[in-house]
Every structure is written in C-alpha cells, then in structure tokens.
Amino acid sequence: MSFSVADVRKDFPIFERTIRDGKRLVYLDSGATSQKPWSVINAESDFYSKHNAAVHRGAHQLAEEATDAYEGARAIVADFLGAKENEIIFTKSATESINAVAYAMGNAEPGNRFALTASDSIVVTEMEHHANL
C-alpha cells in the first residue's frame, strides 16, 4: 500500500483553497494549531450542535453525554497507544503539553525513571519556540 499525499489532502477542506498568487496552501505551524480533516470537523459540529456541555461538571443529560464522549475519546487514544486510560491527559496546546512533561520530570521523586539529576542534559535546537525552553 502506498502513501498518497493527494489522497490525504482531500480529507482536509482547507487545502482546497489557494493563497497568494494562486499557490496551494501549505501549513507548517502545527504547533500553534492543526488543520482538521472532515471527520474531525463533522464530529465537532455534531458535538457542538447536539451535545455541548461542560465535561465532568453537571448531572444533566447533556453533561453526561459530553463526559461520555470525552472519556470515550480517552479510551480510544489509550487503546491506540497501548496505554492505560489514566495515563492519558488532554491539554489545550503544545506549550501546555510540554510544560506538563517538564513539571512532571522536574518534580519526579529521585529514583523515578523520569527524575532529572545534575548530570542530565536536555538538548534543544535554536528552532524551538521560546515557550518550550
């Protein structure tokens, strides 16, 4: 089975548009936001139009539906990664995710496999966003 970039692009409606001088859109700022395929756009539209409520914040039907969808997504991600559901966290951005990892490593108990020691080094490139340093 071969990988077809053209077929993947068809799943993302934003890539049907052109930008300056009629050039095809190429989006490389995925750290800031990710472009959405039709499956995500449709799922979000369905959620916001039929089930929108705060997750884990209410005892009414919409809150239960929202919570079930949220926890269902967690189960799917855990299964995909071969992880336990309680090992999966959702964050709002790449920066928040990187900060969560940094805090977890910085606060890990000595002897924990994620604990940093004085002899450890963290290597980053000049290309890293300032928020990730």
Q: PLM features: residue spans?
A:
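Pyridoxal 5′-phosphate
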Residues: M1-L133
